[in-house]
Amino acid sequence: MPEGPEIRRAADNLEAAIKGKPLTDVWFAFAQLKPYESQLTGQLVTRIETRGKALLTHFSNGLTLYSHNQLYGVWRVIDTGEIPQTTRILRVRLQTADKTILLYSASDIEMLTAEQLTTHPFLQRVGPDVLDARLTPEEVKVRLLSPRFRNRQFSGLLLDQAFLAGLGNYLRVEILWQVGLTGQHKAKDLNEAQLNALSHALLDIPRLSYTTRGQSDENKHHGALFRFKVFHRDGEACERCGGIIEKTTLSSRPFYWCPHCQK
């Protein structure tokens, strides 16, 4: 499943295609959304927001389309009039004069008013988004030490969207390697230096992944761009200590780590 950085980049692509342009045609697959087709035609997409792995498409008439891709949903951008060759099931089509965005295969789709947006169960449950520039390491540290989370093993905590939205398995693996901790650690057992390092890594690594993953580092500045240090690298040497990276399963997900330097 895509994690926060991938969802945010997808939202950026959708925004670039249709933000601020009048919608010339709107189509929904689900019967409960059909009444909104005429209401949205002629409106503008004003913003596409991410809350962890959910997308909120905001319209100029005050409505918001909530969608969660879950395992199989995917958005696509096409030229208006193009007919994509795919076996996926179309759920949403938002069309402008030149570009159209399509949502395939997702099933968790709702239209929300401004009031419903504040009471939606998933949005109420989800924690602060790691890509929200307003979120600080100090606030993350307070969250780590809160009664709700301080006694949770990191193996499960770093997958829990109620703790921090946008984290997922590869980020869990890379964050814990960065700070030299294992999945069995808990916040209550860390010293001040470890807590500070983890609080920063929980924001720095997702943000680095969002801004630079997939880009080439032409100047060869080590560490300037995101790349996997341990994820999917079992059997290779750890670049920090030379130990051999191992693979196991934690919280029902593959987990990669270096037993030599993650203590």
From Swiss-Prot:
SUPFAM superfamilies: Glucocorticoid receptor-like (DNA-binding domain), N-terminal domain of MutM-like DNA repair proteins, S13-like H2TH domain. GO terms for molecular function: class I DNA-(apurinic or apyrimidinic site) endonuclease activity; damaged DNA binding; oxidized pyrimidine nucleobase lesion DNA N-glycosylase activity; zinc ion binding. SMART domains: Fapy_DNA_glyco, H2TH. It catalyses: 2'-deoxyribonucleotide-(2'-deoxyribose 5'-phosphate)-2'-deoxyribonucleotide-DNA = a 3'-end 2'-deoxyribonucleotide-(2,3-dehydro-2,3-deoxyribose 5'-phosphate)-DNA + a 5'-end 5'-phospho-2'-deoxyribonucleoside-DNA + H(+). The keyword Amino-acid biosynthesis does not apply. Its cofactor is Zn(2+). Keywords: DNA damage, DNA repair, DNA-binding, Glycosidase, Hydrolase, Lyase, Metal-binding, Multifunctional enzyme, Zinc, Zinc-finger. It holds the Pfam family H2TH. Involved in base excision repair of DNA damaged by oxidation or by mutagenic agents. Acts as a DNA glycosylase that recognizes and removes damaged bases. Has a preference for oxidized pyrimidines, such as thymine glycol, 5,6-dihydrouracil and 5,6-dihydrothymine. Has AP (apurinic/apyrimidinic) lyase activity and introduces nicks in the DNA strand. Cleaves the DNA backbone by beta-delta elimination to generate a single-strand break at the site of the removed base with both 3'- and 5'-phosphates. Belongs to the FPG family. This is Endonuclease 8. It comes from Salmonella dublin (strain CT_02021853). The gene is nei.
